A protein has these predicted regions:
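Juxta-kinase regulatory segment immediately upstream of eukaryotic protein kinase catalytic domains
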Residues: 2-45
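Alpha-helical protein-protein interaction elements
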Residues: 15, 24-27, 51-55, 105
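Residue-level detector of alpha-helix boundaries and kinks
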Residues: 17, 21, 47, 134-137, ...
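A short N-terminal beta->alpha junction/helix N-cap motif
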Residues: 20-23, 50, 78
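ATP-binding glycine-rich phosphate-binding loop
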Residues: 45-63
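ATP-binding pocket architecture of kinase catalytic cores
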Residues: 53, 63-172
């Protein structure tokens, strides 16, 4: 990962981005601002609400942005470091299998930006009552999780995906 700076986009024609988002590369920030501007009218986005949603162990970053129909998620995955094709392929397989995954609304493969539906900020663990493992609410959540796992198991994808073997695991680490 790289150092973070607070470079800003001086072009007033760009959307007013939330200054809480930091960019190490001013060119990447400008590309993001231009891409976001193109999505704003189409999806009713409010660029000033862009904020960090989460990050993972890769170069990908995730932002949450408010829109006319609620919040959406933006994935920033620089193409030089991240290939989003496997993500898109798996997302489409899971969605076709009726698994609760974010819907891909827009994908700019060349720039590595993606607009996704937002499943919310809460994880399964955060919704459980840890000191009451058999509580009714917990049971309902566990049942929902099991139903999702069953749907995943019913997806016939062996011929569409590379095997997740030791070599692939090592590349991802």
């Amino acid at each position: 990962m790289s150092d973070v700076s607070t470079a800003s986009v001086p072009d007033s024609s760009q959307p007013n981005l939330n200054s809480a988002i930091h960019w190490a590369d001013p060119a990447r920030q400008a590309a993001f601002a231009a891409w976001l501007q193109g999505q704003t009218a189409r999806h009713g986005l409010r660029p000033e609400t862009v904020r960090s949603a989460s990050s993972d162990a890769s170069f990908r970053r995730y932002f949450r942005v408010d829109g006319a129909q609620g919040s959406l998620i933006i994935m920033d995955a620089p193409p030089a470091q991240e290939d989003c094709k496997p993500f898109v392929q798996v997302a489409r397989l899971l969605e076709a299998g009726q698994v609760g995954v974010p819907h891909i609304l827009e994908w700019d493969e060349a720039q590595g930006f993606m607009l996704l539906s937002d499943l919310g900020a809460h994880t399964l663990l955060s919704t459980l009552t840890p000191d009451q493992p058999y509580a009714t609410g917990n049971r309902a959540r566990y049942n929902e999780a099991l139903e999702e796992l069953i749907r995943i198991q019913h997806i016939q994808a062996a011929d569409q995906l590379k095997p997740y073997d030791d070599a692939l695991l090592q590349r991802e680490m």
